[in-house]
């Protein structure tokens, strides 16, 4: 891997290790020409990720992008090594600026190498790669926004409506390693999915991650772009910010703590109860809940508010049993053990003080 200590290189190196590849040679700026020669001569697969995108002098584009790629191809050809080569290029290769020209000429050099030697070659024109270990003010706006917002530093946005296309580093890495077991036809290949958004939407989403600690309302962070952005944002948190506190409401019955809220999938909480304490004694019309006793022994009582039908059950911590509250049934939960009881609670909606859908009524009048 050339550029092994860069953003993509680090992620790729870790993934290769996870897959059991133990003979990975990393080439960095600290490596000598002899190191590069030896690594390429014996390589079974080459990931050429090294390049220059923010040089001190514009001439470094040609040297670090075109020149280095030509060197890689020459060493491989002279060694008679027809190992497959992946080139990390850029969508800017389609542009006629110094950087774009240098990347396009690097592509041409690799494609010519493949044609001349028969070696499989793969060119990835990547766009705004983001993810953990990216560098702020260098790799992408995502890295800069995540770094600054995680630290309370202002970000600058000139045009919130400006479009931006993104690709997640994990998806890039999976495309790369996929070639090790399932080769594709030589030429231009893609890594995806690619996500289309705007600079303003990107900033708002990341700001929302930071604000969620106070509001406890988390975005839909389980799929797609938001999932990848959330993981990237968290990777920029300094260690002293890995933990945060939420409000704990305490009274003679025990504690109640709201932990996590979602826009449309309810909220998670937990509560404690001292021995003999009864909570609840109310019913709902639409609101529903799931209870799981984590510690202690609970007695649940239910009464249908119209027919008067009664039901009761007992559950203990460690049983992994969920008890649901049913609309139209008043219910309570009593700690019938000798120690503190701890109960996890999910409700299907965020508590609304204006419309609580909670009406007091004892199970046993």
Predicted regions and their residues:
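Short acidic-glycine-tyrosine-enriched beta hairpin
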Residues: 305-327
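N-terminal Rossmann NAD(P)H-binding glycine-rich loop of SDR-like oxidoreductase domains
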Residues: 1-17
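Mid/C-terminal beta-alpha module of Rossmann-like enzyme folds, strongest
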Residues: 178-248
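Conserved Rossmann-fold NAD(P)-dependent oxidoreductase catalytic core, especially the SDR/UDP-sugar
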Residues: 2, 70-108, 112-117, 121-124
